[in-house]
Amino acid sequence: AICSLVLYLLTLMLMEKLSSNTVDAQEVELIWTILPAIVLILLALPSLQILYMMDEIDEPDLTLKAIGHQWYWTYEYTDFKDLSFDSYMVPTSELPSGHFRLLEVDHRVVVPMESPIRVIITAGDVLHSWAVPTLGVKTDAIPGRLNQTSFITTRPGIFYGQCSEICGANHSYMPIVVESTPLTHFENWSSLLSISSSL
């Protein structure tokens, strides 16, 4: 539509149907400056509102805090008392057969499927980024700042990701593994982990 209008005006100018008074008129310049500005504002305001609405989950079923360190992640399940752990990459020499090299961790993040999950992300030392592409999640972890993202898994499975911010020599050794399970399995896992951490 805009290209058509520009081509139409260009054609009129080349055919000299527009006089020099029309081309140099202040009114025309004012109109073609203000009209696009109004259109852009009318497009931007609803877009910004939708952008902020997409980032918020009204009432998540589970809130998880991910803290990036050089070169591992700490996870805290804030809805549970004393449920936290560090997650390190499993070295290739200790990797079980059939697991992915540089992607497997010693403690996976376990979440219930079909539940809104909020992840609060920060860092303890340098910039990191918590990214799980198959969940459509990538959020920067910045020291001293809390960022949040959210997701819902619709099926059980294991979702792999990595730190996607160059954070030092071992940046590629910060995998993220999210395991989505049915709610009953998640409840069993969380109670077992709570018991083992209290011992």
From Swiss-Prot:
Membrane topology: Multi-pass membrane protein
Enzyme Commission number(s): 7.1.1.9
GO biological process, one term: ATP synthesis coupled electron transport
Pfam families: COX2, COX2_TM
Ranges per topology, Mitochondrial intermembrane: 55-199
Ranges per topology, Mitochondrial matrix: 14-26
UniProt-annotated binding residues for Cu cation A2: 163, 165, 167, 171
Cofactor binding: number and manner: Binds a dinuclear copper A center per subunit.
Subunit structure: Component of the cytochrome c oxidase (complex IV, CIV), a multisubunit enzyme composed of 14 subunits. The complex is composed of a catalytic core of 3 subunits MT-CO1, MT-CO2 and MT-CO3, encoded in the mitochondrial DNA, and 11 supernumerary subunits COX4I, COX5A, COX5B, COX6A, COX6B, COX6C, COX7A, COX7B, COX7C, COX8 and NDUFA4, which are encoded in the nuclear genome.
PANTHER family the UniProt entry points to: CYTOCHROME C OXIDASE SUBUNIT 2, CYTOCHROME C OXIDASE, SUBUNIT II
Protein's recorded name: Cytochrome c oxidase subunit 2
Gene name of this polypeptide: MT-CO2
